[in-house]
Amino acid sequence: MRERIAKLTSNILNPFLVSLVLILLLSFRSTSSTLDAVKWLLVSIAISILPVLLAIIYLVRKQRLESPFINVRKQRTKIYLVAGVCAGIGCIIFPYLGAPPTLRAAFVAGLSAVVVFMCVNLLWKISLHTAFVTASVTVLIILYGSIAAVTVVLVPLIAWSRIELKHHSPAQVIAGALLAALIAVVVFYLFGLL
């Protein structure tokens, strides 16, 4: 029963779904019209989530990755590179497209996290599930204040699930959470959004 709950938690709070929800909330929070929000949502998904997801699907089908949620540390490098290129493209073109500051900050935070986590990944595996949830919770609290504080319960929940499934150690989930929160706070502060 515990394992089923842990799997369900990990599947629901996966990096792709968490990113999608965060981009959706940021798009609607940072624009004045629904049309603009939908535009930035679609552009953000096309630049960030979709290419990474397609790369993972391709590599899984070619049996170069064990699964969509890459548990083998050495297999993560390819995905870090794809994610880094996508985030870098977003960081470059968003200012020219007039993207809202919150979305630009999110892409800079994403690129920063990819670089840091890719370096860590050379020697040690870190929990991306926990990192994505923690970064998203941090950004939501920054933007929405105390009303978003209720989302903090998702951090220990996802951390527990990753440990329960034996995909990560307690140190790996704690490191993922702390680094992700720190990166989000620093980037949003530098953008004047904190």
Please identify what each model-predicted range represents.
Residues 36-51, 109, 139:
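Alpha-helical transmembrane segments
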Residues 100-194:
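Membrane-embedded catalytic cores of phosphoryl/pyrophosphoryl-handling enzymes
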Residues 52-63:
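Membrane-water interface of transmembrane alpha-helices
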Residues 26-39:
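Short, hydrophobic transmembrane alpha-helix segments
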Residues 9-29:
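The first (N-terminal) embedded transmembrane alpha-helix
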Residues 1-7:
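Short, Lys/Arg-rich, polar N-terminal cytosolic tail immediately upstream
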Residues 18, 81-92, 131-134, 180:
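Core segments of transmembrane alpha-helices
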Residues 9, 66-83:
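Juxtamembrane helix-capping/reentrant segments at transmembrane boundaries
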